[in-house]
């Protein structure tokens, strides 16, 4: 009976990895939509998010069924409770990609981003997408050290976001308040996508070790 139970836990972990992969694909397409004013890519991100939402409902149902099925021991409880948190993080990652796609669609056929911030956004997107891919990988291999590296790699996103804000508040900014606010909001979406990927890594550490590290502790793994 426990063998079957553990098999279902393994299947649950696989579904989490699939959700994370879908969120990463959504962010890649949202970035393409944003940087290239690609309305087709934007529409696909918005349309495909329904699949992530449906998966969240199904995977949550599976997780709670595993809680009710037997009396899970400590390690199994960690897996299930971590899974519930990771489900929320990955769904939110997909939702952030949708926000980017919707802004792109609203402004189409115009380019959303002023020229002086386009390179910054391209770099932010690279970091966000790479962190999403790494989050998916740590869900598969459950390596606490690799999971902890997500936190360190997020520093690049923080630096890029600070640079973006410095451009927006500079007296040389000539695109007005509305564009400035919209650009800041888009930057925040990329930053939050990366934050959720880091949180997936933190939950994997807890799943494996039984310790949920603080921001200061995570680099010790």
Swiss-Prot record:
| Molecular function GO terms recorded | protein homodimerization activity
* Compartment list: Cytoplasm
Q: Which BP terms from GO are recorded?
A: intracellular phosphate ion homeostasis; negative regulation of phosphate metabolic process; negative regulation of phosphate transmembrane transport; phosphate ion transport
The alphabetical list of record keywords is: Cytoplasm, Phosphate transport, Transport
Coiled-coil zones: none
Q: Which InterPro entries match?
A: P_transport_PhoU (IPR028366), PhoU-like_sf (IPR038078), PhoU_dom (IPR026022)
**TM regions (residue ranges):** none
User: Which Pfam families does this chain map to?
Assistant: PhoU
Give the record's GO CC terms.
Answer: cytosol; plasma membrane
Q: Which family does it belong to?
A: Belongs to the PhoU family.
Subunit note: Homodimer.
What is the recorded function of this protein according to its Swiss-Prot or TrEMBL entry? Answer: Plays a role in the regulation of phosphate uptake. In this role, it may bind, possibly as a chaperone, to PhoR, PhoP or a PhoR-PhoP complex to promote dephosphorylation of phospho-PhoP, or inhibit formation of the PhoR-PhoP transitory complex.
Q: What is this protein called?
A: Phosphate-specific transport system accessory protein PhoU homolog 1
- State the species of origin: Mycobacterium tuberculosis (strain ATCC 25618 / H37Rv)
* Upper classification of the organism: Bacteria, Bacillati, Actinomycetota, Actinomycetes, Mycobacteriales
Q: Which gene encodes it?
A: phoU1
